[in-house]
Design a protein with these regions (language model features):
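Metal-dependent catalytic neighborhoods of phosphoester/phosphodiester hydrolases
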Residues: 16, 40-81, 98-102, 192-203
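Cysteine-dense, low-complexity repeat segments
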Residues: 79, 83-89
Length: 283
């Protein structure tokens, strides 16, 4: 099984149409079984898409934000379908981003989706508050595993600290871990290199970093330098890179490889984050 995660930055990216096409071509080549995306945007007030055009989309219970014409997840799923690669997909919007976008998260799956859910992680639930955060998860058919796309707050945020959001995730998945593996995919907003903060909090809770489990891995760096959200938090503005995008599993899964993708080496850069692609199974 191949699993991909990427903080897309989507519509906020310069040269967005070109980067959308590059991303689609990457997915067509690699064909991940599961794709977890963060910062999946659409323009506030753009035309709403008719339900019959949302091919493959599974609605999220309780979701109120409609899918609009320039929705990034819709664009990706639609382009893949036109190229002959079908994905089932889920999107939820939960806050205003950059003062002009419905910002949300998405998951795409090659397998049909049996269950989907979204839970509030932040203490605030205000659509106009950029600190509002949710987790979006699904279970594929014929599987007891759950997969969640996450975009966490910062460890030292006085209003919405990482630890409180992490405790809410733990409560969400507690029962599910008894029946199958749970996978957390996304932007954890905490460098793996920093001790005593976000990364160590997750690890101390018994979760397994698939990067460390991988038989074959690279440097894991998913952010070069200081990007949006980190410029006021990194003392050294010339920092070379951080491993803040991670894939965690509740069990010690067999991971064949973990590699950074869409980083300008083998693949073009499409976001201010690079992606992570893991492949499960024995080497």
């Amino acid at each position: 099984m191949k699993i991909l995660t990427l903080n897309t930055h989507s519509l906020q990216e310069s040269y967005y149409p070109e980067k959308l096409e590059w991303f689609v071509q990457f997915v067509l080549r690699e064909q991940p079984d599961i794709i977890a995306l963060q910062e999946v945007n659409q323009t506030v007030g753009a035309r709403r898409i008719r339900a019959d055009r949302l091919v493959g989309m599974v609605p999220v219970p309780g979701a109120e934000t409609p899918v609009r014409e320039d929705n990034h997840a819709f664009a990706v799923a639609n382009a893949l379908r036109r190229s002959g690669l079908e994905y089932h997909w889920v999107w939820i919007g939960f806050k205003i981003g950059y003062d002009k976008y419905d910002e949300g998260m998405a998951i795409l799956s090659r397998q049909p989706i049996a269950e989907v859910e979204s839970h509030l992680l932040s203490s605030c639930d205000d659509y106009r508050n950029w600190r509002t955060r949710r987790v979006l998860g699904f279970r594929p058919v014929y599987s007891t595993d759950w997969f969640y796309t996450v975009h966490m707050g910062w460890w030292q945020d006085a209003e919405e600290p990482f630890r409180a959001q992490w405790e809410r995730i733990e409560a969400v998945v507690r029962e599910k871990k008894k029946h199958g593996a749970v996978w957390l995919l996304g932007d954890f907003n905490g460098p793996a290199e920093v001790r005593g903060e976000s990364y160590d909090c997750v690890k101390a809770a018994g979760w397994c970093d698939t990067y460390l489990l991988a038989a074959d891995r690279d440097d894991g760096i998913t952010v070069e330098g200081a990007i949006d959200g980190w410029r006021d938090k990194v003392a050294d503005q010339n920092v070379s890179g951080m491993r803040i995008d991670q894939i965690w599993c509740s069990e010690k899964a067999a991971i064949r490889s973990s590699r950074v993708v869409l980083n300008g080496k083998r693949d073009p850069v499409v976001s201010d984050h690079y992606g992570i692609l893991i492949e499960t199974g024995e080497q």
